[in-house]
């Protein structure tokens, strides 16, 4: 009986302890769950913040009203003047016109501002003539081609206007060396142009402005090769432009250049002047005798 009473009293004493231990375990489990939830919340917050900071902003092209109007105008001009030869999707038309995909607004500026496009007829080489589009129309067509086909762009001033005077490099000696190395074999050392094979020719650079010379080097129109930045850097192109415009515009220190075509016309002029002088002198001597 005593043992039984002792056992019952022990059980009664142990029950509060068990309840207290169970309560402590419950509190520990609750604290663990709260701490785990808090850590998870902190981790999600930090990872979300890092993702927001480090993820690059998507490059979404959003055209404003002005650019949209420019593209609409360009498409209208293209559809009325260019689509019959170059195709509705710029893919080109066999035996009529090449693809315009990848030529960029630089090619549009050169071809249209020099009057070569639209072409009046098919021939070995399209000659320069007065342009039929004004500057704003050329910009619109160029913007449409650039938006749909991509390619080299026109160099512009900070205000968005087409760059001209700023394209003239200052190292004219370097520009002259580069011109003689890369261009003079076709365009003559003074930029007067020259004949090529199959009815083709290198045109006179005299009427070309700075932007037209640059875009010609970027796009390689007709028989001209392209000059990528790996061949001629942008600064090298500017020096060539500066040299060409200086040679064309400045007075020749040697006197009248006879068109700048080189020794052939100069030799012919010397021969004619010499023969006329000799004949005149002979007649004068004969008359005195």
Swiss-Prot record:
Membrane topology: Multi-pass membrane protein
Any one GO molecular-function label of the UniProt entry: ubiquinol-cytochrome-c reductase activity
Record note on modification: Binds 2 heme c groups covalently per subunit.
Keyword Protein biosynthesis: no
Region (Disordered): 1-28
Binding residue positions for heme c 2: 183, 186-187
Biased composition (Basic residues): 1-11
Sites where the protein binds heme c 1: 82, 85-86
Pfam families for this protein: Cytochrom_C, Cytochrome_CBB3
Annotated Cytochrome c domain residues: 69-149, 170-248
Listed EC numbers: 7.1.1.8
Entry-linked InterPro entries: bc1_cytC-su, Cyt_c-like_dom, Cyt_c-like_dom_sf, Cytochrome_c_Oxidase_Subunit
Keyword set includes Translocase: yes
Spans through the membrane: 37-55, 267-287
Any one Gene Ontology cellular component term annotated for this protein: plasma membrane
Complex and partners: The cytochrome bc1 complex is composed of a cytochrome b (QcrB), the Rieske iron-sulfur protein (QcrA) and a diheme cytochrome c (QcrC) subunit.
Summary of the function given for this chain in its UniProt record: Cytochrome b subunit of the cytochrome bc1 complex, an essential component of the respiratory electron transport chain required for ATP synthesis. The bc1 complex catalyzes the oxidation of ubiquinol and the reduction of cytochrome c in the respiratory chain. The bc1 complex operates through a Q-cycle mechanism that couples electron transfer to generation of the proton gradient that drives ATP synthesis.
Protein name per Swiss-Prot or TrEMBL: Cytochrome bc1 complex cytochrome c subunit
Gene label: qcrC
